[in-house]
Amino acid sequence: MDLEIRLDTPGTLSKKIPFCLGLQITSLKITGFLNRQDFDDVLDDICSSMGTYDDDDNYILDLDQSPSLRCLDMGEAIFVDGEELPFFGFHTQLETLILPKGISSIFESGEHDTGFSGSEMLKKLVLPEGIKILDGLHDCPNLKEVKLPESVECIESYTFAGCTSIEKIRIPKNVSYFDGSSFADCHISRFELDSDNPNFKEIDGVIYSKDLSRLIAFPSYYPHANFAIPPTTRIIGCGAFMDSRIDSIEIPESVEEIEEEAFQGSEIKSIAISDSVKKIGKLAFRFCRNLESIKLSGSISKIPEQLFSSCHSLKKIGIPSNIKRIEYTALAWCGGLEEIIFHSGVEEVTPSGPLLIRTSHLKRVVIPDTLKSLPGGAFSYSGNPDVFELDSRNPYFSLRDGILYSKDGTRIISVPNRNRVRFDVPAGVTVISEMVFLDMVNLEEVTLPATLKTIESRAFQGCNSLQSITIPASVTHVDINALWADNLEDVYLGCSIPPTMTGPISQKDWRYRNVRLHVPRESVTDYRNSPGWQCFDITPL
């Protein structure tokens, strides 16, 4: 059913479109005046699809259960209730959406998205003249027709990312901000730029700052396999090459900085970063699935978080001596990585989260004499029990039967090969570092020495074959997350005085309510009143 309505009084749409009627309308044109109440009472309902989420958190649209509306035309209406378009719709089933006049932003403050992001059906979007800020239109794979009004000043990051049917875009003259992620993965072979825009310059379909010192945005479907960055470029901007289909990029000596997400998701196979580059932002090469080799700049001192995460084709990487610090997650999810060489000069691998790799080809990790800090559980996902090669001059670590310890042997740091069924922590160890046994799903039995004092965070998390563990009376500190193993049934603890529980403690922790904690009979009351331990099912030994 097609319907055309004029509203002389804002807030009265519900009187003209009862709920049952609204679900039957296929095309709706509204003229006159709209306010927030009209969106909340009517438009939100008739523009929201019905569906479910699959196991991968993808939204599956159910057209049989969704409203019938496919075209909503508000182009001759005026929104009179502020300048921000209210949030309405959810994974909208609309195919054509024409927004009203009177708005300067389609993104409502306090919301994380718009109701029409992630819409698989939206094909045409008409934005009103007067709109200044664009955001939240990402992941609409069939959106093809969109024209940016001359009034647009800002196109936020990721605004049209994943709108894979957009083939042509023209940046209006008043735009002062956008970046490469704004149109990431759009089917654009070249950007068009209004010649009167005072902020940007277009050369061969690529957008630069007006003075050519910053490369702003590279089209995802650039028609050539190779690209040489111009020698005027000093900064490769945030998300500049995101999701670009290009094999190789030449970086000139003029480039001093590569900002975060600059090459994320691009199809580059190799890259050499010149020594002129002094800073690289986080996530700069994340999801570069074809990246096989990389030469790092000799002028940077830090590798930030997730710099190469999910680079599945990367098999070998050498961290040069000029790098003093590398975030552990810089190499997260690199399942194809076989060899990591830390050259002499590297001092620190900082704990910024686990690598989250369940299967791994990692065969070799070279630890130099200068490395003094590694997070607990580092590189333990390797199936090679002898993955570590330790420089004998290193004064901070020791290696025994392939297991990495502190130099004096009092702290156990990493136990490679997660296929172990049993492990005996040797006498002399006083600290089990964080995540040492993380996700050792086959581990059924572990023995702890009488010298042990501290069990750090997530030490046994994910050890789902572990049903029982005995903690010696020598232990004084246990992290609340240390014993998070789904099938753990019994914890035997011989301490008369409850060890101090560290970490984010709550009075009721669902993870431990069915875990029996066996403690000395005379200490049962103390444990039941002790923060953290009170979450267990406490019973006397």
Regions found by a protein language model. Name each.
Residues D8-I17:
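Surface-exposed ligand/attachment interfaces on beta-rich extracellular proteins
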Residues M1-T9, T26-L34, D55-G82, T92-S105, ...:
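Structural signature of tandem-repeat unit edges
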Residues D40-C47, N226-A228, G239, R422-D424, ...:
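Extended Gly/Ser/Thr-rich low-complexity repeat segments
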Residues K16-L21, L43-G51, Y59-Q65, P86-F90, ...:
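Leucine-rich repeat
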Residues S530-C535:
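Helix-loop-beta element that forms the nucleotide-linked donor phosphate-binding surface
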